[in-house]
Amino acid sequence: MAVAEVSRTCLLTVRVLQAHRLPSKDLVTPSDCYVTLWLPTACSHRLQTRTVKNSSSPVWNQSFHFRIHRQLKNVMELKVFDQDLVTGDDPVLSVLFDAGTLRAGEFRRESFSLSPQGEGRLEVEFRLQSLADRGEWLVSNGVLVARELSCLHVQLEETGDQKSSEHRVQLVVPGSCEGPQEASVGTGTFRFHCPACWEQELSIRLQDAPEEQLKAPLSALPSGQVVRLVFPTSQEPLMRVELKKEAGLRELAVRLGFGPCAEEQAFLSRRKQVVAAALRQALQLDGDLQEDEIPVVAIMATGGGIRAMTSLYGQLAGLKELGLLDCVSYITGASGSTWALANLYEDPEWSQKDLAGPTELLKTQVTKNKLGVLAPSQLQRYRQELAERARLGYPSCFTNLWALINEALLHDEPHDHKLSDQREALSHGQNPLPIYCALNTKGQSLTTFEFGEWCEFSPYEVGFPKYGAFIPSELFGSEFFMGQLMKRLPESRICFLEGIWSNLYAANLQDSLYWASEPSQFWDRWVRNQANLDKEQVPLLKIEEPPSTAGRIAEFFTDLLTWRPLAQATHNFLRGLHFHKDYFQHPHFSTWKATTLDGLPNQLTPSEPHLCLLDVGYLINTSCLPLLQPTRDVDLILSLDYNLHGAFQQLQLLGRFCQEQGIPFPPISPSPEEQLQPRECHTFSDPTCPGAPAVLHFPLVSDSFREYSAPGVRRTPEEAAAGEVNLSSSDSPYHYTKVTYSQEDVDKLLHLTHYNVCNNQEQLLEALRQAVQRRRQRRPH
């Protein structure tokens, strides 16, 4: 839960003294060095000393002042550069200093070494003094901190006979949410939001006469009053400037807190009644379960393209047939399995109905000819929708095009359904709560193994468990700054979210589009790529460039697709937020910290203007992480794994991740026999760890299905062929790049996955009994 408090500021004085024995980056002359200082919690831009020419031991003796809050993690970056006007400045030394190590009133002199072996050193003095100011209103969950904002309104009006269209101006408030703004005089009001205690200034200049500038310090403006100025020019007044500074809202649009939101908690209360009734019937209990005896059961589905979507339909139908679907409170999906969930939740009562209808619709879409998705009329429709999104303010990226093509692959017509619409399917606890997973990364600078943060999407909220920051799902994609909603954009259709959740497939798609000049060439390239992915390895993010003479379908979208090809560029709702001084020790953050940058707050996600969201398959093909939050208190996970290469591979990766992070999870240790010949269902549990959920793992295997068409019903010789399902990773018709199945193949996969669930009814019931027993044992006596 977020806590609000008034925090007074301190004055941090940094005096850059001198350096000793700096190595020269120039071949002929000594170094021409300067030092930059960056403290993003106190200043929006880097400050810089003067340049000392031709010296390996430069003396600067320059002081810089920063107003800081001791509740924030104030990490200053100091860098020494060797100036080079020809080839660009060369970095010599980079060090970090945590101002939190200073006490109020303390003076300290630091000597920073160039390297453990090098002789070069940088000497800096630091002094921290308390200030007797009014303080600032801070809101924090112990990891992130939101600060007071001030809002500056600027109105420009012409004063002479000049036409406003003749004069273009640029307005800048450094560090503001809006950044530089350009417009003609008299075109309206401009707004700038920035932290209230920053000593910023408004700068206005004519674009055709940059020497003409107006500067207005914001700290000198009275709050709530209009201040009128006249723009100074060399000839005559050109425009009248009206300024009004107001305090920003204190109520945040971003929820800073850990654990389920109020809407999810209310849903769980409703769902418990459904679960209790289903468990009483399934387990043939004598009486009703008490509220604290009702276990939390979850389904976890992995990715795998059309294979995952089809298999999940079959397994859900099996659970429905056994009367066990109503025992489930959560269902999580990744990549291809999210397609199934998005389809099903268009019907608010889907789990209370026979799934035969949705399954038949699935078959129609999976078996249809896909050539039409690149027909000229479709390409034009994609272009129009992408252009409209850009006009509304959404960043453009390749994943948006993939989302529209993927929608055409899965549906005959565009669907207007949105993620927040799925709340209707939860209104009286009639269905499990769906949670969709994505991975936030750093783009091309780091791999997903070096930096990957789990992001979860539900009908109620989108957010990061690591940071304890969430927004209502209908606001995902809108613009935020310092926890405040700056610009609300219309909620995206869910196909654009599916594009994020499954853009592992966009790598192959993008390559094919780049090379193709007509649909037939596109599909030829797609199939050729599919043949090279015999073990379903994660595709590299580097795409081979086609010859310059190659015709490309992608050129049709060149002006609209300006972002990194495979990353979903989304406005960052964490933008501007700072870190609490003790964020690194916070139990929720420490549970999820697993990147190379977690100890560097200035480089974490709140510092980025955009999120870079990818398919979780780029790290681990699982959707389990939302279920492992202790506040969700999940007792039993039904693990539905659709991998063709290794029945336990992804689950073992997940187990290793949990072990490294200290997250309670049972050891995943299948025997050599199980590895070689996996069964339809495996149980993993850890009785010694009460916080670890039990896992009932269903790998995608064909075991007794070869001999039985239904539990206890042996196949006749005529039915033998129907029991042969090709699940080899090299030549399977269910390879993840396959977008069309034959009628026979889709029927086999549906029957197999349905059978594997129904054939393990007793194991499912026993796992549910154990979950109830576990709850009873935890009751206070």
Swiss-Prot record:
Q: Which InterPro entries match?
A: Acyl_Trfase/lysoPLipase, C2_cPLA2, C2_dom, C2_domain_sf, cPLA2_C2, LysoPLipase_cat_dom
**Which of UniProt's keywords are assigned here?**
Calcium, Cytoplasm, Endosome, Hydrolase, Lipid degradation, Lipid metabolism, Membrane, Metal-binding, Mitochondrion
Q: What is its EC number?
A: 3.1.1.4, 3.1.1.5
List the active-site residues.
Answer: 335 (nucleophile), 615 (proton acceptor)
Coiled-coil annotation reads none
SMART domains named among the record's database cross-references: C2 (SM00239), PLAc (SM00022)
Residues holding Ca(2+) 1: 26, 32, 82, 84
Q: What residues bind Ca(2+) 2, as annotated?
A: 26, 82, 84, 90
Q: Which cofactor does it need?
A: Ca(2+)
Gene Ontology terms, cellular component aspect?
cytosol; early endosome membrane; extracellular region; mitochondrial inner membrane
**Disulfide-bond pairs as recorded:** none
Q: Which SUPFAM superfamilies match?
A: C2 domain (Calcium/lipid-binding domain, CaLB), FabD/lysophospholipase-like
What molecular function terms (GO) are annotated for this protein?
calcium ion binding; calcium-dependent phospholipase A2 activity; calcium-dependent phospholipid binding; lysophospholipase activity; phospholipase A1 activity; phospholipase A2 activity
PLA2c domain location, by residue?
246-781
Asked if the keyword Metal-binding belongs to this entry, the reply reads yes
Tissue expr: Widely expressed. Expressed at higher level in brain, heart, liver, cerebellum and pancreas.
Single biological process term from Gene Ontology: parturition
Domains: entry comment: The N-terminal C2 domain associates with lipid membranes upon calcium binding. It modulates enzyme activity by presenting the active site to its substrate in response to elevations of cytosolic Ca(2+).
Q: What does this protein do?
A: Calcium-dependent phospholipase A1 and A2 and lysophospholipase that may play a role in membrane phospholipid remodeling.
Q: Provide the protein name.
A: Cytosolic phospholipase A2 beta
**Gene transcribed to yield this protein:** PLA2G4B
